[in-house]
Amino acid sequence: MKKFIYIVISFLLVSCSSNALKKTIILSKASPNYVNWLMDSNFSIVNAYDCNNIDSILLLADGIVLTGGEDINPLMYGDSSNLLLCEAMDFRRDTIEKKLFDFALSKQIPFVGICRGMQMMNVAHGGTLYGDIPTELGDSVVHRNNGEVMHDILVTCKNYDYVSMIFPQLSI
């Protein structure tokens, strides 16, 4: 899984730029895992969560990763009823990630969201979330898998050159 995430992030950044100089990746909130995945590459890593002035780092960004983590505050998607369902929330992080997402969209900077990061992209773009899937949907949707997390996926793409760059062993 770590290798896959590294490949996806590397692919997004390499495919969107022809410049071979060291790229600056902004992580919304760094953890040792994210730093380790990117450390051996030609990336300079900036942890946005540790910055006092987000505006000062935005112009450095060659790519942005909205990382995984705690629940997004339901007030960000207009649902005060979910406040009691959500676990730990971090309003500062929510604000930072929304700003990073908006900046990436406006400047057409490559970005990727991992778990919570994908949820933040949805919320920042006006979407909503289920505060707690088992509470809101019951047991009809299996949300947690304590076993194997790998599974087959169907890839459909009009430009197979990009797919073959990520998965060279794939036969089409």
Model-predicted segments: where are they?
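Active-site oxyanion/phosphate-handling segment shared across diverse enzymes
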Residues: 172
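N-terminal beta1-alpha1 cap of cysteine-dependent amidohydrolase-like domains
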Residues: 2-4, 15-114, 122-130, 134-169
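Sec-dependent signal peptide hydrophobic core
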Residues: 5-9
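Conserved SAM-binding loop
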Residues: 117
